[in-house]
Amino acid sequence: LSAFEGDERQIEKILETYTPNQAKVFNHFLFDGEEHELFLCKPASGMTSLFKPKKEALDFFNGFSKLGEVQSVEKIKTIRLDDVPKLRDFDFLKMDVQGAELSILKNGENRLKNCLGVQLEVSYFSLYENQPTFGDVDVYMRSIGYVPHQFLDVKRWSIAPTIFNGNFRTAGNQLLESDIIYIKNPL
């Protein structure tokens, strides 16, 4: 297993889950190989991203304004997936990178040639400025020879100010994001 995590605050979680014999952790921000701003949110929020949180989108969902609060902004250097040294070929790729999936895929086409399956977190509603949505990712994945295999998780959220059972985390009907697996098109 190869894991990529540029946010040093999150590396410890990976190492708690996998031993060094099970996983090699690359301390890189995958993207397009250029310098970018990193919008750091609270570690537990899972919303740190290379894309700036979009206030009006966060306000649309209960509780997201707090989750998407940017604590600081840092300049960081990214690396293309195709350019990662000492990375062996892989047959499965899993990504949850807060909107950066499409750029990473586009900058990793050579690495994807032998990859049989890809698991991505895709958004139906852009929570970040210029964040590609599910439609953008799906069109691209099909263009490089992958087809949807299955949805693992479909996350719904309640629209503000609606709260169910007194808990803002209780799901509503608004589609938010999903984990989807793509496989190489067998036809």
Segments (PLM) and residue ranges:
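Phosphate/nucleotide-binding beta-alpha loop and adjacent structural elements of enzyme active sites
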Residues: 1-187
